[in-house]
Amino acid sequence: MLKIKLEKTTFENAKAECGLVFIVNKDFSHAWVKNKELLETFKYEGEGVFLDQENKILYVGVKEDDVHLLRESACLAVRTLKKLAFKSVKVGVYTCGAHSKDNALLENLKALFLGLKLGLYEYDTFKSNKKESVLKEAIVALELHKPCEKTCTNSLEKSAKEALKYAEIMTESLNIVRDLVNTPPMIGTPVYMAEVAQKVAKENHLEIHVHDEKFLEEKKMNAFLAVNKASLGVNPPRLIHLVYKPKKAKKKIALVGKGLTYDCGGLSLKPADYMVTMKADKGGGSAVIGLLNALAKLGVEAEVHGIIGATENMIGPAAYKPDDILISKEGKSIEVRNTDAEGRLVLADCLSYAQDLNPDVIVDFATLTGACVVGLGEFTSAIMGHNEELKNLFETSGLESGELLAKLPFNRHLKKLIESKIADVCNISSSRYGGAITAGLFLNEFIRDEFKDKWLHIDIAGPAYVEKEWDVNSFGASGAGVRACTAFVEELLKKA
């Protein structure tokens, strides 16, 4: 992992094998830009990367004066430096966007540091010829870019230390999620997921309760149990409950995650091509584990409960079937018409369990629907719920964190599509349209009236796992939901 070292020196005087200079909005007037004639000769116009071998400076373009593009460019920089086999790099302090805000410097330092640290991630556990990065150190010269001196009132050193702490915690938390989601299903079972949660709990002095199928039976969590029936005796289910309790808590927050460690679709079997990447169906539960790590280390003033429903959805003699009717923990009956709509069954019981804790806010995370990916693309998560203020807060704070989010509206016409003639609700819509929303409306059936305005549903099916590099994410798992929800909790507590 890349170590970031803060030094009270100028960029020119800092010692490293290579310098890193960002060209913001194609502006070459910065004092750190050397040998402009060379750049002109090679027609480098401030896009992509360019290595000045004579001065040992890597130039990286930042398309616009924007904090998110700075983060992405920092990530591109370390990936390039890794390929070039430099052992150390030095960089100065930049401010991109929002120059009128007092926290502009802090936010840009967070973006810079996070981009630098996330860029080197690669899931290579099973590669026999691992290529470990020789890039080990980034020196940050605490020299303030002159235009900032009039607009940023925060102390530079204080901001740098705060930003570095954030970047280190967020990188660790995201990598916990990435590693867990990327873990293949032969290893990443419900029991394994619980073991990862126990490690996080031990390191952060959290309470943890890991419940088996007997507990689920006692609590009448029959929808959850049904999904696991084909795996029971081989890979039994686990209800994982993590608890972070600070001395002073302004809010009680329940975070609920879908933890499908593998999903073949059950008897409503997926086509072979659609099964590939279904190890990532534990993205929501993994995000909750990462969030507990982040929120505990950041020391947020909220009591946070992380609830993960971990199970497989497989085929076998005991598998639950289309036409089954399940009685959920909430007491509502569910007509099963498609066993591949299983995540919502697990979440229904887990949300019921979460409501028993009487939280002030409930947020669930799930790789719930392919329809969400069709509607929003593979880089954007969906936000659903009843409370407009809460949805807006999650969207704005999440977007500021660097994640892409969009609100999807509930409506009475789509609600009719999950009605059942023989049970209280059907687990699948009667229409092929609006599938992301109808899945959210299904979950809504299990939210009690007193919690309707306290609940948000986040569908992370798109960005949780993408088979290519994008933004600050490597091939595979991204840790979707962690940055957004951390920012949401912090903003929520400011209003408490």
Curated annotation (Swiss-Prot):
- Asked whether the UniProt record includes Chaperone among its keywords, one would answer no
Q: Does the keyword Phosphoprotein apply?
A: no
Quote the protein name from its UniProt record: Probable cytosol aminopeptidase
UniProt lists the family membership as follows: Belongs to the peptidase M17 family.
EC class, as a word, reads: hydrolase
What are the recorded GO MF terms, alphabetically? manganese ion binding; metalloaminopeptidase activity
Q: Which organism is it from?
A: Helicobacter pylori (strain HPAG1)
Predominant subcellular localization, coarse grouping: cytoplasm
* Record's GO cellular component terms: cytoplasm
Q: Which GO terms describe its biological process?
A: proteolysis
Annotated InterPro entries: Leucine_aapep/pepB, Macro_dom-like, Peptidase_M17_C, Peptidase_M17_leu_NH2_pept, Peptidase_M17_N
Residues binding Mn(2+) 2? K258, D263, D281, E342
PROSITE patterns per UniProt: CYTOSOL_AP
Q: Which residues form the active site?
A: K270, R344
Classification via CDD domains? Peptidase_M17
As cofactor, the record names:
Mn(2+)
